[in-house]
From Swiss-Prot:
Residues 26-89 form the S5 DRBM domain. It is found in: Plastid, Chloroplast. With S4 and S12 plays an important role in translational accuracy. It comes from the Eukaryota. One of its GO terms (molecular function) is rRNA binding. The N-terminal domain interacts with the head of the 30S subunit; the C-terminal domain interacts with the body and contacts protein S4. The interaction surface between S4 and S5 is involved in control of translational fidelity. The gene is rps5. Part of the 30S ribosomal subunit. Contacts protein S4. One of its GO terms (cellular component) is small ribosomal subunit. InterPro entries: Ribosomal_Su5_D2-typ_SF (IPR020568), Ribosomal_uS5 (IPR000851), Ribosomal_uS5_bac-type (IPR005712), Ribosomal_uS5_C (IPR005324), Ribosomal_uS5_N (IPR013810), Ribosomal_uS5_N_CS (IPR018192), Ribsml_uS5_D2-typ_fold_subgr (IPR014721). This is Small ribosomal subunit protein uS5c. Belongs to the universal ribosomal protein uS5 family.
Length: 176
């Protein structure tokens, strides 16, 4: 009897381990690490700020920002922040976006247009990294305004949040 209970408990423990490891595999890409300083009464306190894009290359993406005393901890904290800010976006069969879209954040504006299969990601800077980590393979994007990497990454995430599918539009207009 007790050996049966031990086997059952062992199976339960193993099933918990397996379920924890079956989370979706997320890809992290570093946009920028910068050394920042805080001026205090005792002098300057140096720390590092990391900007990281996290995604599963299948329609989920998030941007994370964090500061820490060393680069490794800043990167880890930025990864966890990116996981908290994950959004989902619709991707077409051609691995593109469904329609034209624009997003703003601060003084940055990002315009995205769907592209034909095989054209690749035509974008620059942080917008390219966000689109690649999101899993979009064929798109044309242009960033206008400020060249700030963090704000451009956030503007591209805002643009991707504005994407809708035909089903969502039909439901919104009550065209069922």
């Amino acid at each position: 009897m007790s050996s049966d209970l031990k086997k059952i408990n062992k199976v339960k423990k193993n099933s918990r381990r397996i379920s924890n490891t079956q989370e979706p595999k997320l890809v992290e890409r570093l946009i920028k690490i910068s050394r920042v300083s805080k001026v205090t009464k005792g002098g300057k306190k140096l720390s590092f700020r990391a900007i990281v894009v996290v995604g599963d290359e299948n329609g989920k993406v998030g941007v994370g920002v964090a500061k820490a005393d060393d680069v490794v901890n800043a990167f880890k904290k930025a990864k966890t922040d990116g996981r908290k800010n994950l959004i989902e976006l619709p991707i077409t069969k051609a691995l593109s976006i469904p329609h034209n879209v624009a997003g703003n954040f601060g003084a940055c504006k990002v315009i995205m247009r769907p592209s034909i299969e095989g054209s690749g990601v035509i974008a620059g800077g942080a917008v390219r990294i966000v689109l690649e980590v999101a899993g979009v393979k064929n798109v044309i994007a242009k960033q206008l305004g400020s060249n700030n990497l963090l704000n451009n990454a956030r503007a591209s995430v805002c643009a991707l949040q504005n994407l809708t599918t035909k089903a969502q539009v039909a439901k919104k207009r009550n065209l069922d």
